[in-house]
Amino acid sequence: MTKITSDDVRKVATLARLNLPEDLIDTYTSQLEKILGYVAQLEEVDTEDIPPTSRAVEVTNVLREDIIQETDIREDLINLAPNREGDFFRVPKILSE
């Protein structure tokens, strides 16, 4: 594994548009080095016979079948409006011509 340098951290910070304080560069260099070490360990794990997954535990949706039902509440809903004009809701004008 390639060693991470302070210059690498500065370059990544610049690419990510992060303004890192100079006194924290060494801290971030050390932390990034450890993270990449963990990734290197994961690369050593044999996953040849393991199928790709997106979750550790399988999740399934509980779906119901859509059933089309006739309803006759249109007039009731329109009557709930504070102001109506025929089959439409009447609302205050918000745009000028």
From Swiss-Prot:
Tree of life domain: Bacteria
Listed InterPro entries: Asp/Glu-ADT_sf_sub_c, GatC
E.C. code: 6.3.5.-
Pfam family, any one: GatC
NCBIfam families: gatC
Function in brief: Allows the formation of correctly charged Asn-tRNA(Asn) or Gln-tRNA(Gln) through the transamidation of misacylated Asp-tRNA(Asn) or Glu-tRNA(Gln) in organisms which lack either or both of asparaginyl-tRNA or glutaminyl-tRNA synthetases. The reaction takes place in the presence of glutamine and ATP through an activated phospho-Asp-tRNA(Asn) or phospho-Glu-tRNA(Gln).
Quaternary data: Heterotrimer of A, B and C subunits.
Protein name in UniProt: Aspartyl/glutamyl-tRNA(Asn/Gln) amidotransferase subunit C
Gene that encodes it: gatC
